[in-house]
């Protein structure tokens, strides 16, 4: 009888744990998902039900996007991907109880949408600014910006009347994605980097030190480890 293959998480995948926790926090904050809302996380270290929080490892303060400075790192460079001209339709994110992170995946699964949110954290606001940074066709860029506005991640305000042009700013829903992006950046620097070094350096302005983002238990404030957490469903 042929054996079924058995799959195990590698160290590389286990280190996405904090990213997964931040995805769960965003989902539970902004969507009603019965399958996710009933999940209770228990921290074995303190024995309590907890909520993941992101704090600075240097000063213990909560990490907020407005307190972060983005500086080019030694591996910084412009996006060199070929310009995509073919339009791929995007679907609106809709609440689903079938998967735990369905809304986040629907929203950020498209590379251009994720890139736009990341650039918005850097302070980019205008269509031309996004277009200059990304090798994306203008019709696709317009479609993705419209979708982010429709989903409440970006707000749209006119800055010029003739011709009419808009600035795009992160809403609270959009700003709440920051911990997700920080954990993803940290993982990417470790496993997808180059010999040139990290492309970006984040400075925590509250303490003036390079950002050491840590995902912690909100009960005992210890850094969360995957093997020290269990789930009650």
Feature map (PLM): residue ranges:
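Short, hydrophobic-biased segments on the C-terminal half of alpha helices
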Residues: 145-146
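Basic, amphipathic "hinge/linker" alpha-helix immediately C-terminal to the N-terminal HTH DNA-binding motif
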Residues: 1-20, 162-181
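Conserved phosphate-binding loops in nucleotide/dinucleotide-binding enzymes
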Residues: 96
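A short, conserved structural fragment
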Residues: 1, 149-159
């Amino acid at each position: 009888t042929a054996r079924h293959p058995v799959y195990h998480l590698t160290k590389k995948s286990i280190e996405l744990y904090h990213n997964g926790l931040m995805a769960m926090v965003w989902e539970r904050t902004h969507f009603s998902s019965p399958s996710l809302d009933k999940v209770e996380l228990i921290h074995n270290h303190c024995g309590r039900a907890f909520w993941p929080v992101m704090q600075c490892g240097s000063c213990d303060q909560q990490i907020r996007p407005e307190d972060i400075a983005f500086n080019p790192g030694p591996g910084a460079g412009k996006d060199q991907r070929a310009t995509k001209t073919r339009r791929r339709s995007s679907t609106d994110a809709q609440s689903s109880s079938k998967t735990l992170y369905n809304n986040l995946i629907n929203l950020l699964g498209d590379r251009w949408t994720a890139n736009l949110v990341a650039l918005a954290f850097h302070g980019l606001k205008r269509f031309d600014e996004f277009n200059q940074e990304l090798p994306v066709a203008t019709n696709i860029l317009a479609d993705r910006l419209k979708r982010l506005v429709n989903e409440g991640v970006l707000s749209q305000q006119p800055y010029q009347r003739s011709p009419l042009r808009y600035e795009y700013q992160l809403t609270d829903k959009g700003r709440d994605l920051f911990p997700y992006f920080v954990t993803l950046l940290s993982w990417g620097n470790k496993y997808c980097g180059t010999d040139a070094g990290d492309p970006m350096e984040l400075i925590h302005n509250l303490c003036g030190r390079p950002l050491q983002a840590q995902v912690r238990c909100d009960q005992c404030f210890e850094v969360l480890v995957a093997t020290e957490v269990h789930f009650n469903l």
